[in-house]
């Protein structure tokens, strides 16, 4: 044909000629020979050969439909309607581009505005940003924001907090030197109110979750908020939004700031990410001006037509670094749009039904697990249930895997006082036969281990 198409090195040859070299090797000839290494790579393969090899490797993976999973502690199997994936894969949405030019980004900006509106209705607070990276970073940003607003240097959290969230909080607070104080749990697995009263003096903020890391619904959330406010601290509530159809919204319980995980709507597990952190505040100018991230607002253009814009974007790229409230860049907007599509599909009735089904499935899981282990705390559980065993959990987990079942998340390594305890989780996708199969397997494994 007379032309060399793929691979085509003509442009490289032209650049080399322009700078006076005949080859790439000549260009780097001053690099000592001893430092030049050959790539230890196999011979090249055709596209079909690569496809076949990757397909063979990927076929070893198992989905939660093939291998029932009870692994909770923050990542859960929720059903995502097919149209959600279809819509977010449209070219108008599927981009890493941040909509800095509102005149060409009205669709994405409106979708994010709808996300904010839906989350505001869900959490009971009017001001919501267009998402953070995930729940953990949203919580950590809330700690920093509390310190900026109150001019204090201490943030109070429950000891029974996700180990991953603790690490994120530690990372965020290390630079500014913000002290974090942990309040222990009581015999019910809930924040110890008396210990909180001792710890809250001089605090910038007090943080609590609904449900907590043990899957329990904290019964004293309103009282915790009052204790925080009496001490001059902000009250921060972290929430799993799938519960908000069946419990009172945190904004109605006195929360100043609400954080959480939006990716539980509209997004698959994806090995734990990407996510989208919820961040909402009450309508207070002091709080709004200190919010991290970006807020999408609705206004009118020069012709009087409705338009969507970035109302607040107090990032260090836009204003003086010392005045910036965050350095969040191209964040999890697509994940937030997916959450908005799913939420709009469910509506208030669907969100309530989702919460009811999860609560029912969790209760059945808890009832059956009580037959083979000790339910550590008495209370109402949502998704997660902590169960203690007499047999080392590492043995139980390994043998469950041999039976094609993924067991719970071992928390004894993080909370040694709980011993051989694991968190088992249920969602709306958990089938009765999966739970029955799990309990039968546990009974058999424990029996074998005790022989």
Swiss-Prot record:
It is an enzyme of class 1 (oxidoreductase). The keyword Hydrolase does not apply. The keyword Kinase does not apply. Its EC number is 1.4.4.2. Keywords: Oxidoreductase. GO terms for molecular function: glycine dehydrogenase (decarboxylating) activity. GO terms for biological process: glycine decarboxylation via glycine cleavage system; nucleoside metabolic process. It comes from the Archaea. It catalyses: N(6)-[(R)-lipoyl]-L-lysyl-[glycine-cleavage complex H protein] + glycine + H(+) = N(6)-[(R)-S(8)-aminomethyldihydrolipoyl]-L-lysyl-[glycine-cleavage complex H protein] + CO2. Belongs to the GcvP family. N-terminal subunit subfamily. The glycine cleavage system is composed of four proteins: P, T, L and H. In this organism, the P 'protein' is a heterodimer of two subunits. The glycine cleavage system catalyzes the degradation of glycine. The P protein binds the alpha-amino group of glycine through its pyridoxal phosphate cofactor; CO(2) is released and the remaining methylamine moiety is then transferred to the lipoamide cofactor of the H protein. This is Probable glycine dehydrogenase (decarboxylating) subunit 1. It comes from Thermococcus kodakarensis (strain ATCC BAA-918 / JCM 12380 / KOD1). The gene is gcvPA.
